[in-house]
């Protein structure tokens, strides 16, 4: 019975690490996506772009999945009159995800 308990603890620890890693990658992805969107919106790099990126990260807490992040950026880009397609948004989100995985793996 003791071996099973230790094994369960090992699985729980691995699950926890995986969830933390997933959270870090997603948050980093959203930040990178937000910085890209800030550039599309013409926001200057630095504090303004960082502040906008934080709003994109926060948008991901509204609902599970990527739809809330895409919708937030899509709405802001449309309001600004910037021509970016849904396909371009999704491609950029995927690029940001790949970069986020790379960055988190290196940290």
Please give the residue ranges for each predicted region.
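A charge-rich, low-complexity, intrinsically flexible signal that marks solvent-exposed coils, linkers
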Residues: 1-107
């Amino acid at each position: 019975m003791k071996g099973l308990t230790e094994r369960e603890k090992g699985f729980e620890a691995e699950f926890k690490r995986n969830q933390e890693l997933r959270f870090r990658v997603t948050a980093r992805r959203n930040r990178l996506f937000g910085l890209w969107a800030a550039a599309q919106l013409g926001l200057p790099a630095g504090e303004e772009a960082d502040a906008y990126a934080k709003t994109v990260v926060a948008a991901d807490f509204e609902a599970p999945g990527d739809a809330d992040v895409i919708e937030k950026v899509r709405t802001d880009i449309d309001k600004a009159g910037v021509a970016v397609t849904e396909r371009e948004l999704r491609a950029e989100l995927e690029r940001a995800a790949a970069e986020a995985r790379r960055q988190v793996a290196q940290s």
